[in-house]
Amino acid sequence: MMIPIAIRWQGKKYDLEIEPNETGSTLKHQLYSLTQVPPERQKVIVKGGQLKDDVLLGSVGIKPNATLLMMGTAGELPTAMPIPAVESVEQEESEDDGYPSGLINLGNTCYMNSTVQMLRAIPELSDAVSQFNSSGGLVAEYRTLLNSMQSNAPVTPMRFLQSLRMEYPQFAEMSRETGGYAQQDAEECWSFLLSVLQRSLSSEWVQKNMAGKLLSTMKCDENEVQEQPSISHDTFLSLPCHISMHTSYMTQGILEGLTQKISKHSDVLNRDAMYSKISRISRLPNYLTVNFVRFYWKASIGKKAKILRKVKFPFELDAVEFCTPELSQKLIPVRDKLREIEKNDEEHERAAKRIKIQPSEDEKEAEAECRLTQVATCQSLVDPELADDEGANPTGLYDLVGVLSHAGASASSGHYQAWIRNSNNRAEWFRFNDAKVSIVPAEKIETLDGGGEADSAYILLYKAKDIA
């Protein structure tokens, strides 16, 4: 049962809810998100004295609607919760009460907050969740959380967090260093939530709109082996971008991930041999997720260390080169026609700015009719099988709509944020830094390509271009 309380600090009042089974440390991390006062500097006064980190909140006599006093000064974050290296850009970003709702950090929960904001960037998925009928479980709590985020005020996702930890206990892991909850891997949170939604939504929305298909061929590398190549079909919810010492572009990393060397037993040779497994996409979904494989297990430190290499990613992705020849043949005519339409649109826009003369109504009507004809031609080129495949991308072209970034040196430390494109203004992106929401220009997103411990892209969300 959640208990509503208020906290007074430096003349300001903060309303929040607490869970009796949580500790004083959890409350202090909530207050840090609201006030920027680091937990170790906070003095929260309760009945009997100062609130201790390891004490259960339900044991100190906090009553509903009680007002507690907090003392402490805001300052730099402690080393256990490092500030991203690019935090100085904050002053260049504007703020407005009309921005989307942020999520309060409940103690190393930025991995969850950024994942929720990324999922929320898919409005059709939110619509599918709103139709979920069950009254219990993680999806029901996610539905409630989405409803509470309709306003612009920051939201405390406590009930959703509790449900997440109940269904996936790994997210309840405690940190040996701080004694509070440990930082978690946002990619694991993303994958887990998607798999839960995939199983739970009766409309099969995730399967239709976010799941792609792979056709893989495995062949022995040794020439003397007369083995027939084996063919397999797999489904994927995320496309890995492998990062080697030679990877400079996301498309390179994806292609590297689609080609693997595998050692396995050969029945013909009666021993282990090297095989090449080459995969190509046989179905492209409406929403394509790309995961930068930036973390690897480093035994010397006992953690997932981070690959800091700079890897450029595109705002517009042409996925045709990742596809099977059969699918590519279906996509290319539509892709080329759509690009032609977009090029014409850009030329008309530049010409209008150059001459600075408003076209007449007749000219506007003629231009609109011409564009409708081009769109109709493009739609007529869509392969019938792709047209009947609900949730499939018939063009192979995508726009970048979301980035989940990580700042820090390992998956179990640092800070996660979400960057979501403004659907009303392509030149602007919303930056979700837990409860703090601000606007950044599209140029800022280009700097998330890595090269150090500052914010670097970890999960990218692409949306299929519309033929319209």
From Swiss-Prot:
GO terms for molecular function: cysteine-type deubiquitinase activity; metal-dependent deubiquitinase activity; proteasome binding. Keywords: Hydrolase, Nucleus, Protease, Proteasome, Thiol protease, Ubl conjugation pathway. It catalyses: Thiol-dependent hydrolysis of ester, thioester, amide, peptide and isopeptide bonds formed by the C-terminal Gly of ubiquitin (a 76-residue protein attached to proteins as an intracellular targeting signal). Pfam families: ubiquitin, UCH. Its EC number is 3.4.19.12. The active site is at C110 (nucleophile), H415 (proton acceptor). InterPro entries: Papain-like_cys_pep_sf, Peptidase_C19_UCH, Ubiquitin-like_dom, Ubiquitin-like_domsf, Ubiquitin_CS, UBP14-like, USP_CS, USP_dom. Component of the 26S proteasome. Interacts with rpn1. This is Ubiquitin carboxyl-terminal hydrolase 6. It comes from Schizosaccharomyces pombe (strain 972 / ATCC 24843). The gene is ubp6.
